Amino acid sequence: MKTQHIVHLSTYPADDIRIFQKACKSEVAEGYRVTQIVCHNSDETVDGVEIRSMPRSKRRLSRMIVLPWRMFRAATQQDGDIYQFHHPDLMLAGLLLKLSGKKVIYDTREFYPDKILSMRWIPAKLRPIASSAFALYERITSAAWDHVIVADRYSAKAFKGRPVSVVPNYPLLTPVEPTTVGKHKKHTLIYVGGLSAERGLLVMLKIAELLRDHNVELQLMGNCPFPEDEERIHAVPNVQYLGNQDLQGVYQHLGEADLGLLLLQPVPAYTYAGENTLKLFEYMWCGLPVVSSDFPNLRQIIESAQCGICIDPRDAERAAAAILRLLEEPELRQKMGTNGRNAILSAYNWPAASRVLSQIYQNVLSGKRSAVEPLPLWSVEPVDAAPCSTRVVA
C-alpha cells in the first residue's frame, strides 16, 4: 500500500518551529511521507522529513512570481497526496497545483489583511486599499482550496462558509526546567519574537531605562529588521540583545528569567492576539509569569490560567510600576509560573493541536470539505479583537 505523501511549500526557514518542528515531525510520526520545499542551501533529510531546496529570491516581486513558479514545478515532481502552502506569496503555486488536479491546503498563521495595515514598506495612504484588496483576493481564492488552516478563531471568520479549521500555535512539550524564583541576584525581564515598535520594542526599552536602578535587566531574543531599532537597543546599558536563538537556546534563556514580556501595541495586526501567540505559551511552559498587553483574547487566556497580568502596553511608566510590584512578590510569581505551566499541560500544547491537524488530513484525503471542531479554550465564548489604534509609543 502506498504511503500517503504530504508536501509542504514554504517561504519560512527550513527549521521553522510551526512547520518543521511541529507539523512535519508530527506527520512523520503518524506514518506519512513528508517533503518540505523551501529556500535552503541543499537537499537533505532531517528527522524523516525530506527537504528539497530552492534558491532564495531577494526581490519582493521575484518572491511573488518567480519563486511560486519554481516551487510549483518542484512540487509537481513530488507526486504528493496533499500539497500544503504556508504563505500568501505562494498562492500562485497553490492555484497552479489546483489546476493540475491536486489537493491543496492553504495554511496561514497570521491575518494578513490586518498585518498589511502595519507594513512599513507600503506607503501609509495605500495600506487600507492594499488591505481591502488582499482580503478580497484571499476570500475569492479560498474557494479553490480543499481546506484552510488558521492559527486562531479571529482569522477563521474571514473564511466563513469555507472548510476552515483552527490549529493553534501551541508549544511543543520540549523538556525544560521551569523558572525557579530567586535563582539569580539580578531580576531579568525577557522577550522572544520580532523586534519592532509595533511589537512593543520601544516600550520595553523605556521600561528597562525606568528600572535600571532596581537591579533589572532586559533580554531580547529575535530578529531586529531595522538598523535604527538595533541602535536603540544597544543604547540602553541594561538591555542585552541575544539575536536569533534555536529552540533550545530560547528555552534555556527563558528558564533563567523572572518575567516574560508580551507588550504588543494596539495596531490592527496584533489586537486579536491570543491562541496564535506562541511566545505567550512558551513563557507559560517555562514557568514564567507573563506581563501582557490587555487585549481580550490574551486576557481570556491569562486570566483563566491566572498566570500573569494584563496592562496598557502604551504606558511605560505604569508598566514599569506593575513589573516592579511583581518582582517584589516572589511567592506570587512562583504561583503564576506554576499555573501557566499547568495550563500548558492541561490544554495549550502541541500534542492537542496536532490532533486537529491529523483530522484535517483525513478529511482532505477522503474528499470531505468540512471544518474540524476547534479545541476548547478555558472560557466558553471566544472574544473579538480590541479596538485598534494607530498610535505606537515612541
What are these regions (language model features)?
Residues 260-262, 282-285, 289-292:
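Short hydrophobic beta-strand element within catalytic cores of glycosyltransferases
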Residues 52, 134-178:
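Donor nucleotide-sugar binding/catalytic pocket of nucleotide-sugar-dependent glycosyltransferases
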Residues 41-42, 192, 217-230:
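Glycosyltransferase donor-sugar binding loop
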Residues 304-305, 309-316, 325-331:
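Conserved acidic donor-binding segment of nucleotide-sugar-dependent glycosyltransferases
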Residues 318, 325, 332-347, 359:
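A short, well-ordered alpha-helix in the C-terminal region of glycosyltransferases
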Residues 7-9, 149, 171, 180-208, ...:
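Conserved donor-binding/catalytic core segment of Leloir-type glycosyltransferases
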